[in-house]
Amino acid sequence: MNIPFVVETVLHDGLLKYKFKNSKIRSITTKPGKSKGAIFAYRSKKSMIGGRGVVLTSEEAIHENQDTFTHWTPNVYRYGTYADENRSYTKGHSENNLRQINTFFIDFDIHTEKETISASDILTTAIDLGFMPTLIIKSDKGYQAYFVLETPVYVTSKSEFKSVKAAKIISQNIREYFGKSLPVDLTCNHFGIARIPRTDNVEFFDPNYRYSFKEWQDWSFKQTDNKGFTRSSLMVLSGTEGKKQVDEPWFNLLLHETKFSGEKGLVGRNSVMFTLSLAYFSSGYSIETCEYNMFEFNNRLDQPLEEKEVIKLVRSAYSENYQGANREYITILCKAWVSSDLTSKDLFVRQGWFKFKKKRSERQRVHLSEWKEDLMAYISEKSDVYKPYLVTTKKEIREALGIPERTLDKLLKVLKANQEIFFKIKSGRNGGIQLASGKSLLLSIIKVKKEEKESYIKALTNSFDLEHTFIQETLNKLAERPKTDTQLDLFSYDTG
């Protein structure tokens, strides 16, 4: 893996090519170049948490230290400096010091065996999204996926940092999309510190998968609209019908928590207090009652806010720009500060009667959709990204799943018509069925080496007749997105 090229792809020419002083590769006749931006790098997670790092202003300095750093800031700052005379503690990595946004990144954190995922799971979800990651890095507890922009977004204070606000909304929407099916850390800084690419941690890299900010913006609009957000307010009510938010379990869980600090940052206190205030507002309580209870809550905190900050948060909640606390955001807060094991059932009250299914073994009829789940799981278990299909017989499938013969034939026909699976049947004594899911085929094509891709696609196309299928369409779509010739004036755009 050409790590210097990976680094340069992410940084988008945001740093000088050579060190300003003591360069070992710049020729004598080449001028150092005008000053650009700076990034921060750290040699271990412990150093990163403690703020002990180095300021880097050139690509040469990064390459000199290849594989010695563990973390960095992939988005470029205007300047970087040190907070102490020994030049050990870095200073300057704040949002109002951002120079250019190069990439969005997602942190996939695996805490339990149940949450275990692979890079292939990330790529599979990305296929549904329609935007592929440029880079996937393996970390100690999971993965980080980079979505590098086609051209960087430049940040200006004149626009009141609207580009940062716009990019934050897109970044949050990307995280929430992946968070529906994968263990995503929804609380980490959008443009902060990430894992740095090294020879020992890059799982996937394809520089062709870079998209314009406009494309991300258009997608983000749709995501925001689908959530029911209004453009003027990003927080929307989302309580249980017929139930006051202050009477729901999540409210008491947050109200009686006191330790809102640590690695996640002190911003947790503000977010929690604002959310609790919204719950009081949506439940019909007066602003005076809310203020009194928030003062009581604040006094119990290990690190309380100033009184004027409490009043500001309560008044903001009662400004009528919001109707209630957002259900998704409530879940994020409770998982971050109370317990990561909490589920929706633990947090929200659901009213009404529900008819529960009998166990499948106790039912005479099984829905085709259930057999579909079993078959897709069977295909996934028996194949992998390097051999995305399995060769077997219908008899073996029937015995493995316990599915009737006619049902299997019908299921194969339906799934093939929907292009969810592809198969080829060979008749005769040594015959059988060659079977693959559409996603596993597409994923294997994406991950195969560039020099082998053409012949590999040709072989799969001949085996499974892939011409004029969604696989061919998706590959074209991912590889041939329209390019933008000019830098966007992002600061006049509404990002939804």
Swiss-Prot record:
Please provide the record's keywords in A-Z order. DNA replication, DNA-binding, Plasmid
Q: Which GO terms describe its molecular function?
A: DNA binding
- Tell me which InterPro entries the record gives: PriCT_1 (IPR014820)
| Residue ranges flagged as DNA-binding region | 120-141
Q: What does this protein do?
A: Essential for replication.
Q: Which organism is it from?
A: Streptococcus pyogenes
Q: Which domain of life is it from?
A: Bacteria
UniProt KW Nucleus keyword: no
**BP terms from Gene Ontology:** DNA replication
Put simply, this protein is called Protein RepS
